[in-house]
From Swiss-Prot:
SUPFAM superfamilies: Cadherin-like, Concanavalin A-like lectins/glucanases. One of its GO terms (cellular component) is cell surface. Residues 881-900, 907-917 have a biased composition (Acidic residues). It is a single-pass type I membrane protein. By 48 hours post-fertilization (hpf), widely expressed in the brain, with strong expression in the telencephalon and the midbrain. The gene is clstn2a. It comes from Danio rerio. Pfam families: Cadherin, CLSTN_C. Homooligomer and heterooligomer; mediates both homophilic and heterophilc interactions with clstn1 and clstn3 paralogs via cadherin domains. Keywords: Calcium, Cell adhesion, Cell membrane, Cell projection, Endoplasmic reticulum, Glycoprotein, Golgi apparatus, Membrane, Postsynaptic cell membrane, Repeat, Signal, Synapse, Transmembrane, Transmembrane helix. This is Calsyntenin-2. Its main location: membrane. Residues 1-22 form the signal peptide. Residues 23-818 are extracellular. InterPro entries: Cadherin-like_dom, Cadherin-like_sf, CLSTN_C, ConA-like_dom_sf.
Amino acid sequence: MKMRAITAMLLLVLSGQCGILAGKVNKHKPWIETSYHGVITENMDTVMLDPPLVALDKDAPVPYAGEICAFKIHGQEAPFEAEVLNRTSGEGVLRARGPIDCEQQKEYTFIIQAYDCGASPNGADWKKSHKAVVHIQVDDVNEFSPVFREPLYRATVTEGKIYDSILQVEAWDQDCSPQYSQICNYEIVTQDTPFAIDRNGNIRNTERLSFDKQQHYKIMVTAYDCGQKRAMESVPVHIDVKPVCKPGWQGWNKRVDYEPGTGSKQLFPKMHLETCDGPLSSVRAMVELQTSHIGKGCDRETYSEKSLQKLCGAASGSTDLLPAPSTSTNWTASLLTDSGRDSDLIFRFDGRQAANIPDWVVPQNLTDQFTIATWMKHGPSPGLRAEKETLLCNSDKTEMNRHHYSLYVHNCRLVFLLRRDFIQLDSFRPAEFHWRLEQICDKEWHYYVINVEFPSVTLFVDGVTYEPYLVTDDWPIHPSEIDVQLTVGACWQGGEVTTPRFTQYFRGSLSGLTIRPGKIATQKVISCLQACKEGLDISSLESLGKGIKFHFNPAQSVLVMEADDLESINTAMTKVSYINSRQFPTPGLRKLHITTTVQCFGEDTCISIPEIKAMVMVLPPSEPRITIAGVERLVWPSAQLRAPVGVALFKDIHIISTVTKTDATLSIARRPGVLELMHNLDYCDVLVIGEELDPERESLEIHHSSLLGKHLDATNSTSGISIYGVDSMAHYEQAIRQVRYRNWKPGSLSERRFRLSCSELNGRYTSNEFNLEIGVVHSSEAVEHVNHMAVQSQFMRPVHHPLVVHTVNSDHISGTPPAATVVIVMCIAALVVIVVLGIYRIHTTHQDSSKEDEEERKDPEMDWDNSNLNSIEGTQIAEEVREEEPEEDEDEDEEDDDLAGDLSSAESEDSDEDEETNIQKGKVKGKLEWDPSTLPY
C-alpha cells in the first residue's frame, strides 16, 4: 500500500515538472500575413493567393513548437479549405471544397489563422496566429452563348424611305464577367438583303424599298459576346413593306386568258380604284380594246366576199374585182397577196402593181344606182406633193385618156369621179365628190362603201355616213365607140402617150373590192359586212345602278363610263367583259388600255391616275376535222343517165366535223377525246376528175329549188360545180344530195370520177377529198344479171366491195339427200312467190301514192324544170336508191309480215327517196321500159 502511494506521488511530481518545462519551450505564436488576395478560375479548385500562404514560428526549430500544424478558416460558410503542405516550412494551400460558379458569386472574403503543433506530440499548449483577411475573386469562363430577348422581331416600313433604324434587336449573355456577358457585335446572316445592322442591334435599310418589287422580307440575325462566342440560334426578323398611298387601280391582272366559245368573260372582277381618301366629285374611265393588228382591224368573219354578202342579205349581182387567183380569175395572180392565218385574202400594192379586169367581168350596165365597196388600209403619201393613188379606174382603152369613173386617194382625201354620157351636152353635172377624213391615212383598216344615187353620192366608213365636203361639176363625156378598161391599183392610160401604160399607182392594201350595179347597199347590210365579232361588253347591266353612265363606240372597242362616287365606278369596272362571238376566233393578244380622270370639288383634276396596260390572250380554238363520208362507187344503167333528171351522185353523203378534246369529261363522245362539232361551211366544190365535161353530151345540174330557204348559191363550169354561202352542214348535205349528173350520149362512157371537198372560213379548215366513181352499164341483160346477183329489185346499186360469186361444187350437189333437195326447191318456190307479190305490192302502192301526190302536193325537190336548172357542167350529181331486202324465214306468213314491214318502212322515207325508189320499181316491173305514170315530172 505504501508503495502505491509513493509511485503516485512520483508521477505527479514528474508531470508538474514537464509542464513547467513545456511552457518554457513553446514561447511564440505562429505568424502570417495580415491579408491575402486570391484568384480562382470558375469550375476549378485551386486558389492562387498573393502573397502565398506561409506561416512562420519563432520557436523553430524546436519540434512541435516551431512547426505549423493547421490553417483554419473563419467565415460564413466559405466554400474553401486550407491545407498545410509542409509543417516545418509552414507552406499551405487554399482549395475550394466544391465547384465555384461565378454566376452565383463573384467574390469571397473570410478570416484565416495558422496553428502550431504545440509543445508535445499530442498538440498540447498550441498557439494560433493573428487573424488574416483573405479576399478571393472568381475568374469567369465564357460558358454561355448570347440569347435574344425575343423569339421574333417584326417591323413595317413605308416604301421609298431610307431609315436610320427600322427596329432594334437585343441579345444577352448569362456569363458573369463584363468580357463574356456583354454583346459586342450583331450580324445579318441572310445574304443579299437591302438591310444592315450595327453593333447595338439597330437594323436599317440600305436602299429604297418598293412595294411592287417585294412586299415582305424575312432576315436572320445573330449576336456575338465580347469573347466572340456566337448565339446558338439566330432570330428571325420580318419586315413588311407598306406601299405609299398611290392613287390608281388595284386588284387587276395584267393578262386575262379567253377560251373560245365561253361567251362574255369579266376582265377585272376584283378591280377597285384607290384615291387615298381624296375627296372627289366625279370619275371618268375609258377602256380601250386595241385590235388593229388582228385581221382587218378586229376579229371578223373571214369568209369570201360572196359568202359574206349572201350571209348579210346583200342584193345579188355584185362583182368581186379582187378574187382569189385561180384559172378563171387569173387577173389577180400577179398582185402581191398577204393572206393571214385565217385565210383572209389581202392584196398589197406598193406603187408598182396593178391589174386589168377582163371585159367579161366588168359590169356593163352601171345605172344611176350602184355601189362600190372595199376594205382599205392606207398611210400618208410620200413626198411633199403627193400624186393621185387610184384604187379603181374605168378609162378609155385606146386613143383617148378619159376617166369615166374612178376612186382614188389624193393628199389624204378620198375622191370619187363619175362622168356620165348625157344627152344634154351643154349642162354641168356633179362629177367629183371629195371627202377629207382621218381614217384615210391612219394606217388602219376601214370599210368604205360608196352608194351612188346620181346625182347624190354617200360614203360610209365603218358603217358611219359621211357627206362630201366638196362636189365639183364638169361637162359630160361625149359619147364615143372607144372601148374602156377597168383597172385596180392604178389607172390605165391608153391614149395621149406613146406607149399605153398604168399611171397613178396605189400604195396600200385592199380587200373585198366589189361593185354592184343597179342597187345600193343598205345601212343594215353595211353594218353586217363590217361588223366586228369581238369587243367589250358589260355583264349584268341591271346591277350597275343609276349612278353610272356609259357608252360604247360603234365597234364596241371603246367603253366610257362616268360616275359621281367611288363605289359606282368600282362596281362598273368589275362588270367590264370581253366577248368574241366567232366559233373559231383568231388567237393571240389583244391590248387593253384604261385611262382614268378624277375630278375634285372645285377643281378640274386633283388626282392623277396612272394608265393601265393589260392584255387579253385569246387561246387557239380546237381545230375541227371535217369529214365527208359516203358510197365511193356507184353503178348506173346508161338509160338512167339519159333520163331528163339524170342521176344523183351523192345521195347518201354525210358531212361531220369533230374536234379532239383533252378534257376527260368529254369521253361521252363518239370516241374518247373526240367530240362532234356543229358549225357552218362556206363552200363545197364538186370537181370532175379527168377530162372536163363536154357540154354537147353531159352536164352537172342542181335544181334551184334545192337552194331555196338556204343561204346558198351555186356556180358552174366545165370543171365542176361550186356551192357557196355560209350555212350549216345539214343544209350543205341537202344541197349536195341534189347534185345530179346527166349524160344524154353515154354510148362510149364506161365510168366517170368526181371529187367533193368542203371548206369553212374560206379555206382555213378544209375537209378530206371525197372521191366518187360511177360505172355505166350499157345492156339491160347485164343490168338484170347484176341485179339478180345482188338480189335487188332495182337497176342501180351501191358497190361497197367487189362482188364475189361462189360456184357450188357439183359433187357436193350430187351428194345432197333427196329430202333436203325437196325442201330447198320448196323454199326457192316460196321465195319467188314472195318476191313477185312484193313487186306487185310496190307497184300498186306507188300508183296510189302518185295519184295522191298529183292531187295533194308537188315535191319541189323533184319538180324538175329544165329552164330553172343550174346546169353545172363538171359537177357530180349522183343518187343512190336502196331497198331493204326481206329476210328469208321458214314461216311464209312471217316472210309476208317482214315484207309488209319493209314496204311500210320504205313508204315512210322522205319524198325524195320515195320518188326515186318508185322510179326504179316502175322500171323493174316494165322490164326497162319507162312507165310515164310513175315519173314526177
